[in-house]
Amino acid sequence: MNLSKIIVLIITTLFISLSCTEKEPDPKGTPEYIAEIQQWHQKRIERLKRDTGWLNLVGLYWLKEGENSFGSSEENDIKFPDNSPPKIGTIILKDSLLTFKSADGVDVLNNDIKVTDLELKDDLTGTRTTLATGSLRWYIIKRGERYGIRLRDVESPILKEFKDIDIYPINEDWRIEATFIPYDPPKQILIPNILGTTEEDNSPGSLSFTKNGKNYKLDAIESRNGFFIIFADETSGKETYGAGRFLYTDEPDSNNIVTLDFNISYNPPCVFTKYATCPLPPKQNYLHLKITAGEKMWGEKH
């Protein structure tokens, strides 16, 4: 066979291969519904990029009882990134009381006002205290009995690198009506987290739904205006994050019907940063179902 025939054969084979490549399905649903989900996704991207979003987390440091000095110098109890002052100050933890004292010559701001000595409120109080110097922002988180510093850098390089999150094609078939089955009394369920610990949470009931002729059930957690669902499925660890995804719903209607719209299921913050403390799905919320809706994995971690 001469060279020209070999080249033609190769080109033909490549053409056939590309032609046989499975095309991703088009969005399915009314134009209004598709636009609604696209708008939700765009707002999700914008929230991630905000100063309060998950993309700019650059540190998580657990505090010990007593004094905890921090800054970029190795001499501190806690070493901040190199773009911070050598010593920013000290956080004193005494029982559950936290106090910040700044180092000399360092401008630390709270609500744009310079502070040198301040009592700190953690994130679970609803009135957390945020401190700032330069492009760094930090506040106290409480997880169980532990207190830690969560650090952000509003000029973190990832903010420039981050563009979007892949999602499955929008498909209104994944907008499913579920029946809310109350627990009386509410059931205590175990919620593991990425730190390796487990906490109990109240589940007011389960959400029962049918897909492809099979029945499935998810334990719900009460949220401000409805339910919060942490779930994993047969895409987890393959096309989506291995530790599951999150989904919020509205409250049940008068017939105890709740809409589960898996097109707005999304990645937990641990996908984007190792400094988040994500809850994981309770074992009963691992579904033997491939949910091809919502956000796919971001980055290389599964």
For the regions a language model picked out, list residue spans one by one:
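Bacterial N-terminal signal peptides that target proteins for export
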Residues: 1-8
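C-terminal motif of bacterial Sec signal peptides marking the signal peptidase cleavage site
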Residues: 16-19
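Bacterial signal peptide processing site
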Residues: 21-23
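N-terminal beta-hairpin/loop module of FHA
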Residues: 32, 36-84, 234-235
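Forkhead-associated
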Residues: 63-128
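Surface-exposed beta-loop interaction hotspot
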Residues: 132-199
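Extended, aromatic/histidine-rich regions of cofactor-dependent oxidoreductases associated
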Residues: 161-167, 236-238, 257-259, 263-302
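Flexible, glycine-rich surface segments
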Residues: 177-236, 241
